[in-house]
Every structure is written in structure tokens, then in C-alpha cells.
């Protein structure tokens, strides 16, 4: 067995105009595919550890040292992107009532949440991700990680993810990351967010 690159759940151009087809093609077929290939190459060196990336990245000390950083970077990259694709929707969706209530409880209002999430995504220096997670106490929390680090390694369960690596937006938005973040909120798959939230609580 090996880690497989998942197909996108929609066409490459399905998220236009927010996310253009060229970016989606490069992002999925090149960047994500490379993370998968590098992950498989690392796992082949240590077949004894298995292939459950969520379990491995939940406690990175259990990963053999010679492949640890490779798996943090590439295994994390695979998990992060596999989740990211599912969190995007070609059809505009309203926030589900359960998630809306949880966001109100945690942040005061949806606008306040959006502001804090945008700040986390804008403020991430260099490459990384912005996240809405369910923390160990079962509460919603906004966080960001560098590179391809995953909140799973901190015992948190991601329910919304935004890739802020330049390869995710530079062709369309150049260096204006805030415009990319604004576009992201127009294509969030809130049904998937709700599904993840219910499973994580």
C-alpha cells in the first residue's frame, strides 16, 4: 500500500473566479503530488511504522529521526491539502446553524471570527496555514502553523484550513494575500466544516 493523491472533488475550474484553474492544477497535480511522493519515499524506509499519518503526526517523537522532518513536511503537506480540497465548494454555502452557534459562543460573532481568522492568515510570516480547530477542551480556537505543520501535532482537530503559501494564490492575487483570504470565505464548504466539527467535539 501507499499514500494516494486524492482526486479533487470538483473540476479544476469549478472554483473560478475565486481560485483560478491554473493555480488549482499546479497546486494539486504538482505541489500536492510532490508531498505524496516524498511521503511514500520516507515511509518505504521504515515499513514498521505503518502509514497512518494522523497517528504518526499526532506524536512525532514516534517517527524515526532520519525521516521525522520529511514526514512533518510532506506527510503534513499531504494531510493539510487533502483536507483543504474538501473544505472548498463550487456552490456558495451558508454557515450551518451548529457551526454558527459555536463560532458565536467562541468569538462573539461571525464577523469577529472572520476578522481573527483573517488576521491569523495575514499575519503568518512566510509560508504556512491558518486554522479553525477544536482544541483539547472541545472549544473552537483560531491558530496558524508554519510550513506544512499540522495542528494534529498539538492535539488539536482542524475543521477549517487555509493554505497561505504563495503557490496557493500568487498567479491570481500576486502579493495581495488579504484579497485571497476574502475570496476563500466565498467558497468555504460549511457542510464539511460542520461534519468535522461534529466529529471533533
From Swiss-Prot:
Recorded catalytic activity of this chain's protein: 2 superoxide + 2 H(+) = H2O2 + O2
Cofactor list: Mn(2+)
Main function: Destroys superoxide anion radicals which are normally produced within the cells and which are toxic to biological systems.
Origin organism lineage: Bacteria, Bacillati, Bacillota, Bacilli, Lactobacillales
PANTHER family named among the record's database cross-references: 37S RIBOSOMAL PROTEIN S26, MITOCHONDRIAL, SMALL RIBOSOMAL SUBUNIT PROTEIN MS42
Family matches, as InterPro entries: Mn/Fe_SOD, Mn/Fe_SOD_BS, Mn/Fe_SOD_C, Mn/Fe_SOD_N, Mn/Fe_SOD_N_sf, SOD_C_sf
Taxonomy, superkingdom: Bacteria
Protein name (record): Superoxide dismutase [Mn]
Enzyme Commission number(s): 1.15.1.1
GO cellular component: cytoplasm; extracellular region
Co-factor binding comment: Binds 1 Mn(2+) ion per subunit.
Main enzyme class: oxidoreductase
Assigned keywords, A-Z: Manganese, Metal-binding, Oxidoreductase, Secreted
Gene3D superfamilies in alphabetical order: Fe,Mn superoxide dismutase (SOD) domain (1.10.287.990), Iron/manganese superoxide dismutase, C-terminal domain (3.55.40.20)
Example GO molecular function: metal ion binding
Gene from which this protein is expressed: sodA
Main location: secreted
Similarity comment text for this entry: Belongs to the iron/manganese superoxide dismutase family.
Residues noted as binding Mn(2+) in the record, renumbered to the chain: 27, 81, 163, 167
Cell compartments where the protein resides: Secreted
Subunit structure of this chain's protein: Homodimer.
UniProt key word Coiled coil: no
Pfam families xref list: Sod_Fe_C, Sod_Fe_N
Amino acid at each position: 500500500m501507499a499514500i494516494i493523491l486524492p482526486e479533487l472533488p470538483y473540476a479544476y475550474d469549478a472554483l473560478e473566479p475565486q481560485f483560478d484553474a491554473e493555480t488549482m492544477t499546479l497546486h494539486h497535480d504538482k505541489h500536492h503530488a510532490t508531498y505524496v511522493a516524498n511521503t511514500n519515499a520516507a515511509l518505504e524506509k521504515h515499513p514498521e511504522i505503518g502509514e497512518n499519518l494522523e497517528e504518526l503526526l499526532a506524536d512525532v517523537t514516534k517517527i524515526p529521526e532520519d525521516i521525522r522532518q520529511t514526514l512533518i513536511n510532506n506527510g503534513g503537506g499531504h494531510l493539510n491539502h487533502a483536507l483543504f480540497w474538501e473544505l472548498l465548494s463550487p456552490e456558495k454555502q451558508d454557515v450551518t446553524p451548529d457551526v454558527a452557534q459555536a463560532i458565536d459562543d467562541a468569538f462573539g460573532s461571525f464577523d469577529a471570527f472572520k476578522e481573527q481568522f483573517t488576521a491569523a492568515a495575514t499575519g503568518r510570516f512566510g509560508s504556512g496555514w491558518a486554522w479553525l480547530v477544536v482544541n483539547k477542551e472541545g472549544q473552537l480556537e483560531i491558530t496558524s502553523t508554519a510550513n506544512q505543520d499540522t495542528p494534529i501535532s498539538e492535539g488539536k482537530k482542524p475543521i477549517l484550513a487555509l493554505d497561505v503559501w504563495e503557490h496557493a494564490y500568487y498567479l491570481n492575487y500576486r502579493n495581495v494575500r488579504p484579497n485571497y483570504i476574502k475570496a476563500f470565505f466565498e467558497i468555504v464548504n460549511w457542510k464539511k466544516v460542520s461534519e468535522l466539527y461534529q466529529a471533533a467535539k
